[in-house]
Amino acid sequence: AALDGDRRIFLTAQKDIMTDDPDFNDLYKLGVVATVSHVAKLPVDGEMIVRVSVKGMYRARLNGIVSTEPHLVGAIRACAIRKYDIENEYGQALIRSAKSIFEGYAQSAPQLSPDIVLSVLGFDHPGDMADFIAGNIALELPDRQSVLEELDPIKRLEKLRDEQGRYMVDE
């Protein structure tokens, strides 16, 4: 359906992947509105797998389900994100700290592309940095969701920095 119109889709996680037919209560309420940028059908082990590439646009809250056939259609509302002052000294120190922790994480995670590491080092906004890192490191779903649900960019990067440090210790 997203491919027939403006290619926008609301993405949210299911709380329990074992639930075959999720309803409103089985879904996390905060997700992302994204644009579908590419769809590829690939043969894998004799089956066709659909791989979809998306670009996140903004956070949104799922307020309800308006239709279940042929797929779930939700009523959503965009979330207001707190503004960030780029001159904020604490924010800049937090970014430096997160970059340092990420570099350490990257050294222990050889599967990370050097391009991802370079991208992280180029960020100067805590919210954007947190979103990018969260999308590129191995986090458990509840931890990833917790980062997504934090709308304050400073608090989001603090939360991710703490999670990232915990995962480095656990690995």
Could you say what each language-model-derived stretch is?
Residues A1-E171:
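N-terminal low-complexity, acidic/polar interaction/targeting segments
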